Amino acid sequence: MQPAIRLLIYIVGLLTAASAAAGIIDSDTYREDRTLFLQAGKALDENRPGDYRRLAGQLQDYPLYPYLQFRELRARLKQADPDEISVFIERHKDDPLGWRLRQAWLYALAKQRDWPQFLAAWHGTQPVKLQCYKLQAQINTGKTAGLVEHALELWMVGKSQEKACDPVFSYLEDNNK
């Protein structure tokens, strides 16, 4: 065999071995983080906030860290600072976590009847129940621009709507709309 071909085979072999070793090293990169992630999730499940914060603090560069943040924020939506929730939603506006937290937060705000905060958190298209809560929020805050048109769209469907729509439909009837 020619020396150039032998050298080429040797180099290809080295590169193959190096890339295989890199794959093994890469697969071990997150081993400790995976363990910490599972422990942090268990701390959340067992309502051990101190342990959660200690463990989560070590995971800020871990790709699944936002899922821990989501779980933790969702668990304490009623007590969480609205700015903290807004920051998370904004940071994750293009992924399902932001969307899911926004919906959970909107439902929590509607349940609390915190209409000003509900309107501040509102964004985009939402399920009918949340649309009706938005209309309730508009009624209760006096921000009724566009309300009648939207309420009539919800009224003019060929099926019963969510119970959350009843106060909105009563508003239409009371105001002869």
Predicted segments — roles?
Residues 1-8:
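Bacterial N-terminal signal peptides that target proteins for export
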